Design a protein with these regions (language model features):
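Residue(s) in the substrate-gating loop at a strand-loop-helix junction
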Residues: 36
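Substrate-binding pocket helix/loop in short-chain dehydrogenase/reductase
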Residues: 1-5, 98
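Short, small/polar-rich loop/turn modules that mediate ligand/substrate recognition or access, typified
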Residues: 28, 68, 73, 128-130
Length: 143
C-alpha cells in the first residue's frame, strides 16, 4: 500500500512543491497531475491505486486555492483504459470485456492524453483550475 501511495501521491507532491518555487517567482504556471478514472470509480483489488489517484484530486484542488491568486493553476487529467505495453498483454477476450464497459467502446491512446495535457498547459486553459478532466471514453461519467 505505502509503495503505491509514495510513488503516485507523495512523489507528485514532492515534485509539485519543488516546481512551485520557480512558478511563484514567475507569477504564473501550471501544475498538471495524471490521475485515473479509478480514482473516481474505484476498482476491485486496487484500493492502494484508487486512493493514490483520488488523493491527487484533493491535492490539485488545494493547490488551486492556495496558488490561484499567484497565477498558478492546478488540474488533474484522469485517463481511463489506455493502449500501453501492459494492456497489450491482455488476451482479446479480456480486452473486449474492458472495452465493452467504455461508452466509446475502445481504449484511449497515449496521444489523446497528451493532447489534453498540452491544452491544460497552454494559455488557452488559463481560467481552468481545480478541475479533473476525464480522458476515459465516458467510463467515469457522473463522477
Amino acid at each position: 500500500f505505502e509503495d503505491v501511495i509514495d510513488a503516485n501521491l507523495t512523489g507528485a507532491f514532492r515534485v509539485a512543491k519543488r516546481a512551485t518555487k520557480g512558478l511563484l517567482k514567475l507569477k504564473r504556471g501550471r501544475l498538471i497531475f495524471v490521475g485515473s478514472v479509478v480514482g473516481s470509480v474505484g476498482a476491485a483489488g486496487q484500493v492502494n491505486y484508487a486512493a493514490s489517484k483520488s488523493g491527487l484530486v484533493g491535492m490539485a484542488r488545494s493547490f488551486a486555492r492556495e496558488l490561484g491568486s499567484r497565477g498558478i493553476t492546478a488540474n488533474v487529467v484522469a485517463p481511463g483504459f489506455v493502449e500501453t505495453d501492459m494492456t497489450s498483454t491482455l488476451d482479446e477476450k479480456r480486452r473486449a470485456e474492458i472495452a465493452a464497459q467504455v461508452p466509446l467502446g475502445r481504449f484511449c491512446s497515449a496521444e489523446e492524453i497528451a493532447d489534453v495535457v498540452t491544452f491544460i498547459a497552454s494559455e488557452k486553459a488559463g481560467y481552468i483550475t481545480g478541475a479533473t478532466i476525464p480522458v476515459d471514453g465516458g467510463l467515469g461519467m457522473g463522477h
